[in-house]
A protein has these predicted regions:
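HhH-family (HhH-GPD) DNA N-glycosylase catalytic core used in base-excision repair
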Residues: 1-259
Length: 259
């Protein structure tokens, strides 16, 4: 593919953003799971768990996310805070690919501990970012805190480690949902103490291919260094809100810009 000029690339990114940052795409996206709810805590917890299982077929992800909420009596915040041992045991029959019922139980208990110690997952991120102004450091702190209590070691694979160089796609996507605030009605914009400029692009195999095709990424591996590179490239076009172009790169794949 011939490399785009900056002006042409800006025009393409803006057109795709305008086309795909729209509420009509919500039902087919994992963000539809937290959209079941109106309360902050419900949305934080449903969003985190939905993002956690967001790999593979999108239709299956969305279906599994909604099914997970039904396992939690469609009241995720109340379930995290108050579920009894008997209710936690009922999670054992849940599964989405390699994320099984035991993993879900350990994640629920970790979220409960986050609620008790920090006032919720959002308050943890906002407070830590306010203290450090360093999102990669906050991502590392969050993972350490999340797994600080007793848990099955196998569940650690479901929360990527930035300290091991992972792209942390699902966490970056979750942060986009919680932090970004615009007039489009897709992202929630609930965590106002974190600026949109602090976010990093959710990078997976498909976004990496699109970024390379558009000249936004040269690194071959889809790791954290690639996340930093492609986010820096997008900041050339919008330093205050670079991750809004996540919609553009998603749309570029749908519209066939890799062909």
């Amino acid at each position: 593919m011939e490399r785009f000029s900056d002006d042409d690339l800006r025009e393409l990114l803006e057109a795709l953003h305008d086309k795909y940052n729209r509420p009509e795409f919500i039902p087919d996206d994992p963000i539809s799971v937290p959209y079941r709810y109106t309360g902050r805590a419900d949305r934080e917890i449903a969003g985190f768990l939905s993002a956690t299982i967001a790999w593979g077929n999108r239709k299956a992800i969305v279906s599994s996310g909604h099914r997970m909420m039904r396992f939690m009596d469609d009241a995720p915040a109340d379930f995290v805070r108050n579920a009894s041992e008997r209710e936690l045991a009922l999670l054992s029959s849940y599964a989405h690919r390699t994320f099984n019922g035991r993993d879900l139980r350990d994640f629920v208990l970790a979220l409960r501990r986050m609620e008790e110690r920090h006032g919720g997952i959002g308050n943890f991120f906002e407070t830590r970012y306010g203290a450090t102004h360093d999102m990669p450091a906050v991502l590392a702190d969050f993972r350490r805190e999340f797994f600080a209590a007793e848990h099955a070691p196998r569940c650690e694979k479901h929360l990527s480690s930035i300290e091991k160089g992972a792209a942390c796609k699902r966490l970056c996507m979750y942060l986009r949902w919680m932090v970004r605030c615009d007039d489009r009605g897709v992202d929630f914009g609930m965590w106002r103490r974190i600026p949109m400029s602090a976010l990093y692009l959710p990078l997976d195999l498909h976004v990496g291919k699109t970024g390379r095709a558009l000249g936004l990424l040269t690194r071959r591996q889809d790791d954290w260094r690639a996340v930093e590179e492609i986010t820096a490239a997008l900041r050339r076009f919008d330093a205050e809100d670079p991750v809004r172009y996540d919609f553009s790169l998603f749309g570029a794949g749908i519209d066939g810009y890799l062909r």
